[in-house]
Swiss-Prot record:
<dbReference type="GO" id="GO:0044205">
    <property type="term" value="P:'de novo' UMP biosynthetic process"/>
</dbReference>
<comment type="function">
    <text>Catalyzes the decarboxylation of orotidine 5'-monophosphate (OMP) to uridine 5'-monophosphate (UMP).</text>
</comment>
<feature type="active site" description="Proton donor">
    <location>
        <position position="62"/>
    </location>
</feature>
<feature type="binding site">
    <location>
        <position position="33"/>
    </location>
    <ligand>
        <name>substrate</name>
    </ligand>
</feature>
<comment type="subunit">
    <text>Homodimer.</text>
</comment>
<feature type="binding site">
    <location>
        <position position="209"/>
    </location>
    <ligand>
        <name>substrate</name>
    </ligand>
</feature>
<feature type="binding site">
    <location>
        <begin position="60"/>
        <end position="69"/>
    </location>
    <ligand>
        <name>substrate</name>
    </ligand>
</feature>
<dbReference type="Pfam" id="PF00215">
    <property type="entry name" value="OMPdecase"/>
</dbReference>
<dbReference type="InterPro" id="IPR013785">
    <property type="entry name" value="Aldolase_TIM"/>
</dbReference>
<dbReference type="GO" id="GO:0004590">
    <property type="term" value="F:orotidine-5'-phosphate decarboxylase activity"/>
</dbReference>
<keyword id="KW-0665">Pyrimidine biosynthesis</keyword>
<feature type="binding site">
    <location>
        <position position="189"/>
    </location>
    <ligand>
        <name>substrate</name>
    </ligand>
</feature>
<dbReference type="InterPro" id="IPR047596">
    <property type="entry name" value="OMPdecase_bac"/>
</dbReference>
<feature type="binding site">
    <location>
        <position position="119"/>
    </location>
    <ligand>
        <name>substrate</name>
    </ligand>
</feature>
<dbReference type="InterPro" id="IPR011060">
    <property type="entry name" value="RibuloseP-bd_barrel"/>
</dbReference>
<feature type="binding site">
    <location>
        <position position="11"/>
    </location>
    <ligand>
        <name>substrate</name>
    </ligand>
</feature>
<dbReference type="GO" id="GO:0005829">
    <property type="term" value="C:cytosol"/>
</dbReference>
Amino acid sequence: MKLSPIIVALDYSNPKKAISFSKKISPDQCQLKIGHELFINSGFFLINFLQKNGFKIFLDLKLYDIPNTIKKTIFSLAKFGIWMVNVHASGGYNMMTAAKDALSHINNPPKLIAVTVLTSMEKSDLSKSKIFTKIINHVIHLSNNAYKCGLDGIVCSPWEAEKVRKKFGNNFIIVTPGIRFKNTNYNDQKRVMNPYDAIKSGSNYIVIGRPITKSSNPYLLLEKILSKLNNI
């Protein structure tokens, strides 16, 4: 069955609120993303609960460490049946290769993707890190490393999705946060796009958090978004 292109970011600190939200939507509408704060506060209890209720889980921990540590961590996480997990592409070739190698020992391994440049960043942020190039060039560079390491795909902003898709083909997964609707608050996001243009640009999965989790009727909102996406 083809998965929904929507990943909802569970931007909660309290697992009870995440559970309450999950009961308002359906697993066929989206996958769910769990980040650092919620994972620390809930552990695998929440993941198990959501999986038992039919949801696929993207564990967004953006792992970044020495290769041996990453290999052991990915191996341990994969045993919990998560759908997708990520590492930082900036961790380097050896780290990403170690992460990929860990999954060779797992039946039905999760998708392994690499974070390129955070959607909260702009060119001046790269310059402060002594990276003097355009964001798109750095995203392509990091994506190329992930591709060579055999990862399933990358995370980038929708601004870079079209060029990443063109360079790495249709089998390379592109996950794009920074999804916002017209006339909504960008919060801490800088490189943003509406969900429909993001999919047109080549994204496989769009990550939407607050616009959906703070909606008075998230089920209906998801249905409206999916209906429009199905016509693209």
